[in-house]
A protein has these predicted regions:
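Hydrophobic transmembrane alpha-helices and their helix-loop junctions in integral membrane proteins
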Residues: 1-275
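Cytoplasmic/organellar membrane-interface segments at the starts of transmembrane helices
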Residues: 80, 210-212, 269-299
Length: 299
């Protein structure tokens, strides 16, 4: 969408400006070498690190995205074909988190320490905000899009907690979230192909007409809400531990707000399962269950 282009273009320009400035600060001459960029950034006075922080952070916050720079994502996901949506949600948004951990944290460490509580606040507020919006969605794609924003908010908060357990949890959760969100998009695509709609008000009874698809939907949904024994649990558990171990004096408050988002996540996810898998609706009378090859692919 045009909004996606504008957000990405502006963020890219901000990141480019920051990197050019850092390269010019290298005492050994202009260089974009990674170690030289780190040395140049870490040696800058605090006031210069402050504005460099926001240039780099906004660029990566758009990619993740987190509140309040998230508005491009639901529209882009809703209007994109499924293969593109999978690439956006499973791969591209993870580059935002990777950029924060690999670039932002070591390049401007003083500014990160100063602004970390602010970013964590935005992240945990975004978890609750996106979860509340997901609850009122009727379009499956938009619901999954807001779900992804909530999950990225938790990852962002853990990244700026900057503890060892949070970093290990980030690696695990980025991988597992990529798998889970891709599976969710595949299920949504199958529903739309078979019954011609993503509107949950017109869906229902899938457990009777497509039991295998229902099983796949339930398993992926449980992983999405990080139920114990699913792949989503261990990473999310480590993210919460990392947030709790943060040096911030507000770490308990952050934990409580993020925990509320997890509860809301269970609400919108289980509501989605209830409205699509059970009940009775005309749209689910036609169509068919997933094939063996499709089921193997989902597995």
């Amino acid at each position: 969408t045009f909004k996606f282009f504008v957000y990405t273009f502006v963020g890219s320009l901000m990141l480019l400006a920051a990197l050019i400035y850092l390269s010019l600060q290298n005492p050994g001459g202009n260089s974009f070498a990674w170690q030289n960029i780190i040395r140049a950034g870490a040696s800058l006075p605090a006031d210069q690190q402050q504005w460099l922080f926001w240039l780099i952070f906004i660029a990566f916050a758009i990619k993740m995205p987190i509140f309040p720079l998230h508005t491009w994502q639901p529209d882009a996901y809703e209007q994109s074909p499924t293969p593109v949506t999978i690439i956006l949600s499973a791969l591209m948004v993870k580059m935002g988190i990777y950029g924060v951990v690999r670039w932002l944290l070591p390049v401007v460490p003083d500014a990160v320490a100063y602004w970390s509580d602010t970013v964590i606040t935005l992240s945990v507020v975004g978890i609750v905000y996106a979860s509340l919006l997901a609850i009122v969605q009727t379009d499956l794609k938009r619901l999954v899009a807001y779900s992804s924003i909530a999950h990225m908010g938790l990852m962002s908060a853990a990244a700026f907690a900057n503890t060892d357990v949070a970093m290990h949890g980030l690696v695990i959760q980025m991988f597992n979230h990529g798998i889970n969100i891709a599976g969710m998009w595949v299920i949504v695509s199958m529903v739309e192909q078979r019954w011609g709609t993503r509107d949950m008000r017109q869906l229902g009874g899938m457990a009777n007409t497509a039991p295998l698809m229902t099983i796949a939907l339930v398993i992926i949904s449980l992983a999405n809400i990080a139920l114990p024994l699913t792949n989503g649990f261990i990473g999310e558990f480590m993210l919460f531990n990392g947030l709790f171990a943060s040096a911030s004096p507000y770490h308990i408050t952050f934990m409580v707000i993020a925990g509320l988002g997890i509860i809301l996540g269970a609400v919108y996810t289980l509501n989605m399962v209830q409205r699509t898998a059970y009940g009775d609706a005309v749209a689910m009378k036609a169509g068919g269950d997933i094939t063996r090859n499709e089921y193997i692919g989902l597995a």
